[in-house]
Amino acid sequence: MKLAYFSVTGQTRRFVSKTDLPNVEITPDDDLEMDEPFLLITPSYAEESPTVSKSIDVMDSVFDFMAYNDNYKHCRGIIGTGNRNFAGIYIFTAKEVSAKYQIPLLYDFEFNGTPADVAAVEKLAAQLDQGAKVTFKNPL
């Protein structure tokens, strides 16, 4: 299973480089079309007010990628990464993408992940490759 990922500070890129999975980086500069199943790994950059939480503009590349030529139709699941110190907006972008496209949020980890996180994502990818089914539950 291929990983499609977005990285702002390099944390997500470092995590992906620790896996043995094929991958492609989402960048703001190109239109990337996916024609095979993939897992999306996205960091979260969000803002929160008393009435609303939303991803900030730096995350537009993730939403643009998912919409481009209906890439979201090939996405088998979403993995969020972030910092738990941000409490209510921890992995918010992953939750927002999951809710928008009704794609399961399958896993989350902090920063650039631990060896256990790498093993868990590789196992999850292998299970999906072997036909495992997952169910969408709205994370918001």
From Swiss-Prot:
GO MF term (any one): FMN binding
Domain of life of the organism encoding this protein: Bacteria
GO biological process: protein modification process
InterPro entries with a match to the protein in the record: Flavoprotein-like_sf (IPR029039), RNR_Ib_NrdI_bac (IPR020852), RNR_NrdI (IPR004465)
The protein's role, per its UniProt record: Probably involved in ribonucleotide reductase function.
Family from the record: Belongs to the NrdI family.
Cited HAMAP family: NrdI
Protein name in UniProt: Protein NrdI
Species of provenance: Lactococcus lactis subsp. cremoris (strain MG1363)
UniProt gene name: nrdI
